[in-house]
A protein has these predicted regions:
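Acidic/polar loop-and-plug regions of large Gram-negative outer-membrane beta-barrel proteins
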Residues: 315-319, 332-404, 419-451, 495-520, ...
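Structural signature of Gram-negative outer-membrane beta-barrels, strongest in the C-terminal barrel
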Residues: 336-340, 451, 470-474, 478-482, ...
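Gram-negative outer-membrane beta-barrel transporters
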Residues: 536-537, 658-740
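C-terminal beta-signal and adjacent terminal beta-strands/loops
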Residues: 731-740, 763-783
């Protein structure tokens, strides 16, 4: 059976990082229109203890998901009575500030403290303002920060990065805007510890800790694990519709059920805003790269109890690769309804297409010719025929209902319906080409299909008392079903082309009738529980577990897993207010892909493993700067590896066989993200890892053992305060892979040397509402 050049087959072009020059100049027009009247946002429940006023304001701003700007030293010695009950944002600030001599006033990006004028004292003036709680909420947009406030990817508990006993990397909205990160591939290239492997122009795979990442979440709802060979929009999603991207490292079986051991990617959508705001972006860059974006958000009723947001983006670009181009329209809408002071309903949807021309297939050129010699072509070489195109699309509708149950308990129901489809007419020069006379044969295939997925998740969370202390509990359950239907066509008739003068001219074959059919359905149900036990003021224990039922049916052999228990254990000990140490253990399993079969054509047992992690975490400046260091081990069973002894027989067997192997990943990583000084944002990370099989031989060597990623921006002061400058570097060590050379009848090592990539950016604030941004990517033109 033919598949669209499965990336785990015998031939493939190793690409572990982009090696091209890209220069993008973007002009952003941002307009934030103030409303004539103050919007009264629906009240929500708060329980903030009495204490220092600055601390209370930070906690309130975090829970209300708003910014508060003030000078910390001005509040020294002032106390707050605390806050308990249901309050609108303004009312909550008023209650906390009662008797302090200050009031909170609405500004464009949140709230600012203003001294109350009295007849006897005249006007009190604050010194220079300082953002203290902007980044501490559950959104990153508008905070200007490179670090998040809270995350819930690992356990459903809303925790700060320091309180989460696993490594988490978050690329915020500000980071994406500063460096022009417009799709998931771009974001992953900036994420510490992640390797991006591009199979061709439309298909990418991501790796973490030695494992492919096939766990995607959208607003915390797991999506069906994607089949990398049949990419259908996941990695090309436009970032215009997302607030941030969270990457939780290691196993995440507690919430995902079945999945991979490397990491989980959670894309968090933008939300409507309480005040009207909008922005338009126009961009132009190298190789006719043009982009436009419009984003409008705000209240839709006088009372503000209905809010909406609409986003549209369109990108039309060519490439350094010959003849390649891609058009990408994206539309997104979301609405929030305050059904009552205690109930919030959210509904939305998105519509995305990627429409390429001259899509490359299985790399951009064949590695070897018919003599087994390595090909040398110009960097812009594209192995695709002009008619080759891997079109992808995504259609999504979603809904969420949240209800305050009282006494700090909240119930939440999330529903998601998604269609990921592809329509691929593929033709490219592959294998051991060209022949000695310069001719080559074009490999062709047509693949069409879609995956229709439905997911539902329901949980309740809240505090409970035990042993004189307050603890947290989450109880939930989820159900999902996805049906993948696809057809494959191919024509094996010779289609000879001129390799040495290749311009993409080739005849499209007559596809005829479908020669392969896919009709597989995956169903998964699960129930989960998580608790955060407050054993002491400085010691927290997280316990959790999930019971999983997993079933695959269709025209491939069925598979069922019932009552599988997936545990989660984590502990955090606070050394002081800044530093904490942690340890965690997580578990996960993943049924094998249908092509992972042994010599007898039997499907391999599910891939499964355990993740151990120990580390140190810290937060500084009221959480505006986060740092972590971790050591991790992943012990894997039933890893699918090529059965080379069988596959390399003469004559070559008709089926390609895999065998099960054990593997262990060991490594460590450090990361820093956030504001290291006023106006100076940073995200930086270093990762080292080694993967060995049960014979102590290194595997997954196409992933670099070491990598560094660092991106930073600084807003200048004084007369240059309209200017922001920044830049970034990516470095990775050598990567290599043994690939079978058919003409030489043996394996040969293909490698990519260690390299640095350097990017620069600058932004100039022309007026209050107009800015211009320049991004220079790969300034030293590494290839």
């Amino acid at each position: 059976m033919h598949t669209p050049s499965d990336p785990r087959g015998r031939f493939g072009l190793l690409k572990s990082a982009p090696l091209s020059l890209a220069i993008l100049a973007a002009t952003t027009l941002s307009t934030h229109l103030a409303q004539a009247d103050t919007v009264n946002v629906a009240a929500q429940a708060y329980d903030i203890p009495a204490g220092p006023l600055g601390t209370s304001l930070n906690r309130f701003a975090q829970q209300a998901a708003v910014a508060i700007v003030f000078q910390p030293q001005a509040l020294e010695g002032l106390q707050s009575p605390g806050l308990k009950g249901n309050f609108a944002t303004q009312d909550g600030f008023d209650r906390l500030l009662q008797g302090s001599g200050y009031r909170a006033v609405k500004v464009n990006q949140g709230y600012a403290l203003q001294a109350i004028t009295t007849a006897s004292s005249g006007t009190m003036e604050l010194g220079p303002t300082e953002v203290t709680a902007t980044q501490l909420g559950n959104v990153t947009e508008g905070t200007g920060s490179y670090t998040p406030g809270t995350i819930a990817t690992s356990t459903r508990l809303i925790l700060t990065p320091k309180q989460t006993p696993q490594s988490v990397s978050v690329v915020t909205r500000q980071h994406m805007d500063d460096f022009g990160l417009n799709n998931v591939d771009d974001v992953m290239r900036h994420t510490p510890g992640i390797t991006v492997s591009a199979f061709d122009t439309e298909r990418s795979n991501y790796y973490a800790r030695g494992f492919s990442i096939n766990n995607f979440q959208y607003d915390g709802i797991p999506s069906t694990a994607r089949n990398v060979a049949y990419s259908a929009g996941n990695t090309l999603s436009d970032m215009a519709i997302y607030d941030r991207v969270e990457v939780l490292k290691g196993a995440t079986g507690l919430l995902t059920g079945a999945g991979s051991l490397g990491a989980t990617i959670n894309l968090v959508r933008k939300k409507p805003t309480a005040d009207f705001q909008g922005h338009a972006t126009l961009g132009a860059g190298s190789w006719d790269n043009y982009r436009s974006e419009l984003d409008v958000s705000g209240p839709m009723t006088d009372s503000g109890n209905v809010r909406g947001r609409a986003v549209a983006a369109y990108q039309d670009k060519r490439s350094f690769m010959d003849r390649y181009s891609r058009k990408s329209p994206t539309y997104y809408g979301i609405m929030e309804f305050d059904l009552s002071p205690d109930t919030l309903l959210t509904v939305g949807g998105d519509y995305q297409d990627t429409l390429p021309t001259a899509s490359s297939w299985s790399g951009s050129f064949p590695l070897i010719n018919s003599k087994g010699e390595r090909n040398s072509v110009k960097r812009s070489f594209n192995n695709a025929a002009n008619w080759s195109s891997w079109e992808q699309y995504t259609r999504t509708v979603f809904a969420m209902l949240e209800h305050d149950l009282g006494d700090g308990w909240v119930g939440k129901l999330q529903l998601d319906h998604k269609i990921n489809g592809y329509h691929a007419l593929m033709g490219s020069i592959q294998g051991d080409q060209p022949q000695p006379d310069g001719t080559a044969n074009l490999t062709s295939g047509k693949y069409t299909g879609d995956t229709v997925s439905d997911s539902a998740d329901l949980y309740v969370s809240g505090p409970f008392s035990l042993g004189g202390r307050e603890h947290e509990l989450v109880l939930g359950g989820s159900i999902s079903a996805s049906e993948w239907k696809g057809k494959g066509y191919w024509n094996l008739a010779p289609n000879t082309v001129d390799f040495n003068h290749w311009r993409g001219h080739a005849t499209m074959p007559d596809w005829g009738s479908a020669q392969s059919l896919i009709d597989d359905t995956v169903r998964q149900t699960g129930a989960y529980v998580t608790t955060r036990l407050n054993l002491a003021d400085d010691l927290k224990l997280l316990l959790g577990g999930r019971v999983v039922n997993y079933q695959v049916t269709g025209n491939n052999p069925s598979y069922r897993e019932s009552g599988r228990f997936v545990p989660y254990v984590g502990a955090i000990y606070d050394l002081n207010d800044t530093y904490s140490v942690y340890a965690s253990y997580t578990d996960i399993f993943m049924p094998q892909e249908n092509y992972n079969r042994d010599r007898e054509n039997k499907l391999l047992e599910p891939d499964e493993g355990q993740n151990w992690e120990f580390g140190l975490k810290a937060d500084f400046l009221d959480g505006r700067l986060n740092a972590s260091a971790a050591y991790f081990e992943i012990h894997e069973s039933n890893r699918a590896l090529s059965d080379d002894e069988y596959n390399n027989q003469t004559p070559i067997p008709s089926n390609y066989a895999y065998k099960s192997s054990k593997a262990v990943t060991k490594g460590y990583e450090v990361e820093v993200s956030g504001e290291i000084a006023p106006g100076w944002q940073l995200q930086a990370g270093y990762t080292h890892k080694v993967v060995r099989d049960d014979k102590d031989v290194k595997i997954s060597t196409f992933e670099p053992e070491d990598q560094v990623k660092l991106y930073t921006t600084y807003k200048l002061k004084g007369n240059l305060d309209k200017l922001t400058v920044g830049g970034g570097v990516r470095w990775q060590s050598v990567g290599w892979q043994d690939i079978y050379n058919n003409p030489h009848k043996g394996y040969e090592e293909f490698s990519q040397d260690a390299y640095w990539l350097v990017d620069l950016m600058t932004r100039y604030q022309v007026t209050k509402n107009v800015s211009a941004t320049l991004n220079l990517n790969n300034i030293f033109d590494k290839s």
